[in-house]
From Swiss-Prot:
It comes from Vibrio cholerae serotype O1 (strain ATCC 39541 / Classical Ogawa 395 / O395). Its EC number is 5.1.3.9. Pathway: Amino-sugar metabolism; N-acetylneuraminate degradation; D-fructose 6-phosphate from N-acetylneuraminate: step 3/5. It is an enzyme of class 5 (isomerase). SUPFAM superfamilies: Ribulose-phoshate binding barrel (SSF51366). One of its GO terms (molecular function) is N-acylglucosamine-6-phosphate 2-epimerase activity. GO terms for cellular component: cytosol. It comes from the Bacteria. This is Putative N-acetylmannosamine-6-phosphate 2-epimerase. Keywords: Carbohydrate metabolism, Isomerase. GO terms for biological process: carbohydrate metabolic process; N-acetylmannosamine catabolic process; N-acetylneuraminate catabolic process.
Length: 240
């Protein structure tokens, strides 16, 4: 595997300075949506870069390749899979890592939770190192972050907090972000940051940067948020 060229960054400290206090935009349209096409993903990537986004989170090797050719900001690349015998969805295979690296990802993120998986998380972390890309651990607990740090993973994210249990919370996990930050990790806040105020609170809690997805790039989800709120208000008005 050839080392990839890390777009504009020689080391992790440069990337950390570049992303400090910034918004990373995750562009992952709803599966099957009319917007779930590479051309639209590229268009959104260009638009958010023009608006000031400092990095992107993109799913799929083909999408990463297309977006990488169209933007100048770094890409956090992932591959999502639905496996019949494992709950791991985010970059579960070394082959996914290699594909993302060749497609132009600057950072490769993977599920760092300690669950049944097709290939060990140690193997995935090492595979990312072998490509020359930076690694990001998508974590659900502080223990996941400790493991990632012990493996030399450069970025630790709160991505999976609340998504590995039976009940999904509605608010971000600021406590996990704070714990990661206080441990000295390069912390990426991610998961349910649906307003500018919540994103700002993530930075105040110690995150270097915050990743925002649904609120910016999933029109169906945001439309439902507004519809739910206005319909409830309409029912209340009619009740009076």
């Amino acid at each position: 595997m050839r080392p990839v060229v890390r777009k504009n960054f020689l080391n992790i400290e440069e990337l950390k300075r570049f992303l400090n206090g910034q918004t990373v935009v995750s562009i992952q349209p709803v599966t099957g949506s009319p917007l779930d096409k590479t051309d639209f993903i590229v268009a959104m990537a260009i638009a958010v870069e023009q608006a000031g986004a400092k990095a992107l989170r993109i799913e799929g090797v083909n999408n990463v390749a297309a977006v990488s050719a169209a933007v100048t900001i770094p890409i956090i690349g992932i591959v999502k899979r639905d496996l019949p015998d494992s709950p791991i969805r985010i970059t579960p295979f070394v082959s996914d890592v290699d594909g993302l690296a060749n497609a132009g990802a600057t950072v490769i993120a993977f599920d760092a939770t300690d669950r049944t998986r097709p290939e060990s998380r140690e193997r995935i972390a090492q595979a990312i190192k072998n490509t020359g890309c930076f690694a990001m651990a998508d974590c659900s607990t502080f223990e996941d972050g400790l493991w990632a740090n012990s493996q030399g993973v450069e970025i630790v994210g709160s991505t999976l907090s609340g998504y590995v249990g039976d009940i999904e919370p509605t608010v971000p996990d600021f406590q996990l972000v704070k714990a990661f930050s206080e441990a000295g990790f390069f912390t990426m806040a991610e998961g349910r940051y649906n307003t500018p105020e919540l994103a700002a609170k993530a930075i105040e809690s110690g995150a270097v940067a915050v990743t925002v997805g649904s609120a910016l790039t999933r029109l169906e989800v945001v439309t439902q948020w507004f519809n739910n709120a206005t319909q409830v208000a309409g029912e209340r008005k009619c009740a009076h």
